[in-house]
């Protein structure tokens, strides 16, 4: 049985005081979870401040990006082991905003995925199509191509340590959401591709999140789909009440 993973991606929001207030509200409320996992991914600048507050709580800590090298002359970058030392257990890789604004490729994301796993971090590998690709009937081929490139060279055992996040780019921050049926269809296609890359048992073990304007009023229907195993939440994760309601989906 796959345990749902509800992750909040704060993106480039919040300073220390706002971040502390948010995680204190989350950790105070989310004390009785037994069948799902919760994660927040704040900006790098907050990791050191929030890690001690989350230690021993039900809320795990993750980062929004990392470099694939262990150290070196990479100005502005963060190494996997640095994240581990700060208490991170997850790292988001290949978010569509990284692909769009910073030119990240499947090959680069693949190097990062290998490095994350080698350093004991669980990568959340993001895939998703833009609106033109969906409208032209290319959504599945685009997503499958991203999966193959981003996960190349990973063993079945390694794949079991990866989380996939399907985020249709046209739905991120727009208020538009894929219908539960459309989201389920893509998640099922992703799981079928994971089976082709490894085996069915491995594919059945991998958590596949949905992301893209997940809100309190649509999370229940999304999470009722058989291949949707959680959510990667953007804007709604910045408000404690909204994110708590999402975590407590029914």
Curated annotation (Swiss-Prot):
Pfam families: TIM
Pathway(s) per entry: Carbohydrate biosynthesis; gluconeogenesis; Carbohydrate degradation; glycolysis; D-glyceraldehyde 3-phosphate from glycerone phosphate: step 1/1
Cellular component GO terms, alphabetical: cytosol
Catalytic activity: D-glyceraldehyde 3-phosphate = dihydroxyacetone phosphate
Superkingdom of the source species: Bacteria
Active-site residues annotated for this sequence: 95 (electrophile), 167 (proton acceptor)
Enzyme kind, highest EC tier: isomerase
GO biological process, one term: glycolytic process
Record EC number: 5.3.1.1
PROSITE patterns reported in the protein's UniProt record: TIM_1, TIM_2
GO molecular function: triose-phosphate isomerase activity
Annotated residues for binding of substrate: 9-11, 173, 213, 234-235
Entries under SUPFAM superfamilies matching the protein: Triosephosphate isomerase (TIM)
InterPro entries cross-referenced by the UniProt entry: Aldolase_TIM, TIM_sf, TrioseP_Isoase_bac/euk, Triosephosphate_isomerase, Triosephosphate_isomerase_AS
Compartments where found: Cytoplasm
Oligomeric form and interacting partners: Homodimer.
Family (UniProt): Belongs to the triosephosphate isomerase family.
Record function comment: Involved in the gluconeogenesis. Catalyzes stereospecifically the conversion of dihydroxyacetone phosphate (DHAP) to D-glyceraldehyde-3-phosphate (G3P).
Name of the protein described by the UniProt record: Triosephosphate isomerase
Organism of origin: Herpetosiphon aurantiacus (strain ATCC 23779 / DSM 785 / 114-95)
């Amino acid at each position: 049985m796959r345990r749902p993973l509800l992750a909040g991606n704060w993106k480039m929001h919040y300073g220390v005081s706002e971040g502390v207030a948010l995680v204190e509200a989350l950790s105070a409320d989310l004390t009785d979870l037994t069948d799902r996992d919760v994660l927040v991914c704040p900006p790098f600048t907050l990791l050191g401040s929030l890690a001690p507050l989350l230690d021993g709580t039900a809320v795990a800590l993750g980062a929004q990006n990392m470099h694939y090298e262990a150290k070196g002359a990479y100005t502005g970058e963060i190494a996997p082991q640095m994240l581990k030392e700060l208490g991170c257990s997850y790292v988001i890789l290949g978010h569509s905003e990284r692909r769009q604004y910073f030119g990240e490729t499947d090959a680069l994301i693949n190097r990062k995925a290998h490095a994350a796993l080698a350093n004991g971090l669980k990568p959340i590998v993001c895939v998703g199509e833009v609106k033109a690709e969906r409208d032209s009937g290319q959504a599945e081929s685009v997503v499958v191509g991203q999966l193959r490139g981003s996960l190349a060279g990973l063993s079945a055992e390694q794949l079991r340590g990866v989380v996939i996040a399907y985020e249709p780019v046209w739905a991120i921050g727009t208020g538009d959401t894929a219908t539960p049926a459309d989201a389920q269809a893509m998640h099922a296609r992703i799981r079928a591709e994971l089976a082709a890359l490894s085996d069915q048992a491995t594919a059945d073990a991998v958590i596949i999140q949905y992301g893209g304007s997940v809100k309190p009023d649509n999370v229940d229907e999304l999470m009722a789909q058989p291949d949707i195993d959680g959510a990667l939440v953007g804007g709604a994760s910045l408000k404690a009440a909204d994110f708590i309601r999402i975590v407590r989906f029914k």
